[in-house]
Swiss-Prot record:
This is NADH-quinone oxidoreductase subunit C. Keywords: Cell inner membrane, Cell membrane, Membrane, NAD, Quinone, Translocase, Transport, Ubiquinone. It is a peripheral membrane protein. It catalyses: a quinone + NADH + 5 H(+)(in) = a quinol + NAD(+) + 4 H(+)(out). GO terms for molecular function: NADH dehydrogenase (ubiquinone) activity; NADH:ubiquinone reductase (non-electrogenic) activity; quinone binding. Its EC number is 7.1.1.-. It comes from Maricaulis maris (strain MCS10).
Length: 200
């Protein structure tokens, strides 16, 4: 299988040399990295080329690397049922530069792109309906970014008296938790189950 993926990787890199910035095979999977502005051209070619025939877009997902100048990777997972291959196509972008939509190539990309926008704030140029998909209408921020606080910015709940949804500052009540902050190196006064060494 890896020999077939190697041949496929070379074929893609040679045919799309202006767009491909690199490719690799790891854990039996081919990953092709491309320039952001060439995504629609490359995916159209991957779909239509007789040696590829990647007719199914399985998923689009985002990855956040805050330390990079182009902090986001957009990852396209493709399937060729004809060739029995799966590949991953990646591109990098930042918070400002829009990624061209691939809805003309794969109509199923519509909701995948909306999810990436909603979770990461990745903007897809020429998307027909780029609005939030999974979060609330007035949601602030992008929850899958690494710099988003784990608790969020506000707490949302239904107020029975007002008969509406209300937004309040986050309040973490943890009275039920009993934290034992003693370091195990300072010597515990009790023996943990299964710790036979502590008895001797």
């Amino acid at each position: 299988m890896s020999e077939a993926l190697k041949v496929l990787g070379e074929h893609i890199a040679n045919a799309q040399d202006a767009a491909v910035t690199g490719w690799s095979i790891a854990n039996g999977e081919l990953t092709v990295e491309i320039h952001r502005d060439r995504i629609e051209t490359v995916l159209t070619w991957l779909r239509d080329d007789p040696a590829c025939r990647f007719t199914t877009l399985i998923d689009i997902c985002g990855v956040d690397y805050p330390q990079r100048a182009e902090r986001f990777e957009v990852v396209y997972h493709l399937l060729s049922m004809h060739q029995n291959h799966r590949i991953r196509v990646k591109l990098s972008t930042d918070e400002e530069a829009p990624v061209p939509t691939v809805i003309p190539v794969y109509p199923v990309a519509d909701w995948f792109e909306r999810e990436a926008f909603d979770m990461y704030g990745i903007v897809f140029a020429d998307h027909p309906d780029l609005r939030r998909l999974l979060t609330d209408y007035g949601f602030e921020g992008y929850p899958l970014r690494k710099d988003f606080p784990l608790t969020g910015y506000v707490e949302v709940r239904w107020d029975e008296e007002e008969k509406r949804v209300v937004y309040e500052p986050v309040e973490l009540v943890q009275e039920y938790r009993d934290f034992d902050f003693m370091s195990p190196w300072e010597g515990a006064k009790y023996i943990l189950p299964g710790d036979e060494k502590a008895e001797g």
